[in-house]
């Protein structure tokens, strides 16, 4: 009988990682070869990371403003918690 597995989750670590990426693009360069949006437990975090990937693909620097603009362009900014939440990620660093 399979009662259901709880997927591994460390949402605080996800948030810390995203804050690090937004604050310093070198962090993205270090993890991008291994990390994919679907690796995030929280859908909001997956969307934020995907926005970072899209920015890199477009040769746009990753920072608080560009991530918020990309999320807004994707109609996802409010879903992830708004600009305030994105900003709060960088304050964890």
Where is each model-derived feature located?
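Noncatalytic partner-interaction/assembly domains of nucleic-acid and motor enzyme complexes
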Residues: 1-93
């Amino acid at each position: 009988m399979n009662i259901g597995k709880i997927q591994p989750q460390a949402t605080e670590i996800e948030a810390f990682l995203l804050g690090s990426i937004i604050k310093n693009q070198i962090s993205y360069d270090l993890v991008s070869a291994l990390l994919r949006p679907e690796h995030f437990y929280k859908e909001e975090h997956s969307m934020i990371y995907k926005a970072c990937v899209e920015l890199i693909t477009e040769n746009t620097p990753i920072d608080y403003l560009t991530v918020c603009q990309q999320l807004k362009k994707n109609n996802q900014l409010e879903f992830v918690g708004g600009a305030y939440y994105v900003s709060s990620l960088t304050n964890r660093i």
